[in-house]
Structures are given as C-alpha cells and as structure tokens.
C-alpha cells in the first residue's frame, strides 16, 4: 500500500514511517524539513511541504492509498498546525479521492 505520513519528523511520525516500512508499505514522508526524518529505505520518498499549504498537500496526497496524520505543535499551544493541517489534508483527500485516513492526536 502507498501511504503518506503528514508530520513525519516528530517522534511519532518517524516511528510511524519505520513501522510502515517494516510492514512492506511504500511510504512518503511529508514534512517542512523531511531531511530530519533520518531514515533511508528504498521504499521511502521524502517530500518537503507545509501541511497548511493546500496545493502542496494535494500534490503529495495524489496517488496515495492512505494518509496518516501525526502533526504536532510542539510546546506552542498557539500553533494551529494540527487543526489547519488536518483540514487541508481532508480537503485534499476529497479532491483526490483518497479514502483511508488515520489521525494521531494528543487532543482529547
């Protein structure tokens, strides 16, 4: 399965990428600084972009089978990356026809 991980440079994102690769999936790691993923694998594609950038998210999601969102705001409670990024991803999925979504969140 082709899976994109949005927010792939955080601890949960990197672990998600590693586990998906170990299970035999083809993974795209999407992050502002994908060089920070720190994983090399023949089935891993690194893609730079901001989760709030609708055009970048849509382009990255096109052709994927599933999306995993592991966005985090870090220590800043004012950062709206989770809400704005998740909304951009959902809209991109609607536009591209990708139907599988997993969202990791610490909100609750």
Task: Name these PLM-found stretches.
Residues 3-25:
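N-terminal Rossmann NAD(P)H-binding glycine-rich loop of SDR-like oxidoreductase domains
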Residues 2, 26-27, 99-100:
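Residues at the starts of beta-strands that form the adenosine-phosphate
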Residues 69, 74-103:
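NAD(P)-cofactor binding segment of oxidoreductase domains
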Residues 35-43:
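Short loop/helix-cap segments at secondary-structure boundaries that form the rim of catalytic
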Residues 9, 33, 107:
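Residues in the short beta-alpha loop(s) of Rossmann-like NAD(P)-binding domains
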């Amino acid at each position: 399965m082709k899976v994109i991980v949005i927010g792939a440079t955080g601890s949960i994102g990197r672990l998600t990428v590693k586990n998906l690769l170990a299970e035999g999936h083809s993974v795209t790691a999407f992050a502002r600084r994908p060089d920070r993923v720190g994983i090399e694998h023949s089935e891993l594609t690194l893609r730079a972009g901001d989760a709030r950038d609708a055009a970048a998210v849509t382009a990255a999601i096109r052709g994927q089978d599933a999306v995993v969102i592991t966005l985090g705001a870090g220590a800043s409670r004012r950062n709206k990356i989770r809400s704005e990024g998740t909304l951009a991803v959902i809209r991109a999925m609607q536009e591209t026809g990708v139907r599988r979504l997993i969202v990791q969140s610490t909100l609750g």
